[in-house]
A protein has these predicted regions:
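HhH-family (HhH-GPD) DNA N-glycosylase catalytic core used in base-excision repair
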Residues: 16-203
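Single conserved hydrophobic/aromatic residue that forms the stacking wall/gate
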Residues: 1-17
């Protein structure tokens, strides 16, 4: 919480929250009985990240979430990291049929062949975008003008619609507007903590 608040010049917010993490209200989606979920909510979700390795990891995980809960994916996150070589982009781009078969037989991750194949083809497109734009965050900024949007209670917006349409045009799969909106929330491009949450910021 401290790093998040200070990174955005919100020292006053940190002072209000300091010492109260154990008691503060959290977003309604956060399962308070799951320590991983609470830590993710408090220290990661909604904090702006611009590095390609993190953005790639989150895009893959969000694509696997389709039809499932984020909590399910988060619980398997370390398994995904192990299975996907810590989401090393070049390594994932080089995955062959043998590696696909290995992933499809790995019961510790989501064994959906379509999603697994999509994650690899999407990785190659992701790498192409990085080469074309300089970074994936620079690509996102083409649609957001580098702004951070503060909004709650939505599942799509104009940004997610446009980014989703462009990624699909480039050949990516499992990147519908709802998934992309969730991705943008996760990486801090859209800040969506509930109004009742202790980390809510009104802009």
């Amino acid at each position: 919480i401290r790093d998040f608040c200070l990174s955005r010049g919100l020292g006053d917010v940190y002072k209000r929250q300091r010492g109260y993490e154990a008691y503060m209200n959290r977003c309604k989606w956060c399962d308070l009985k799951n320590p991983k979920y609470v830590e993710y909510h408090d220290k990661e979700w909604g904090i702006l990240r611009t590095d390609d390795s993190y953005l790639f990891e989150m895009l893959v995980l969000e694509s696997f979430q389709a039809g499932l809960s984020w909590e399910c994916i988060l619980n398997k996150r370390e398994n995904f990291r192990r299975a996907y070589d810590e989401f090393d982009l070049d390594k994932v781009c080089g995955y062959d049929e043998e590696k696909i078969a290995e992933l499809c037989s790995d019961s510790s991750i989501v064994r959906n062949k379509l999603k697994i194949r999509a994650s690899i083809s999407n990785a190659r497109i992701f790498r192409d975008i990085v080469k074309e734009q300089g970074s994936f965050y620079d690509y996102l900024c083409k649609f957001t003008d580098g702004e951070i949007l503060y909004e709650c209670d939505k599942t799509t917006n104009e940004w997610s619609d446009r980014i989703s349409a462009d990624l699909k045009k480039r050949g990516m799969k499992f990147v519908g507007s709802v998934i992309i909106y969730s991705f943008l929330q996760a990486v801090g491009v859209i800040y969506s903590h509930d109004r009742e949450c202790g980390l809510y910021i009104e802009k």
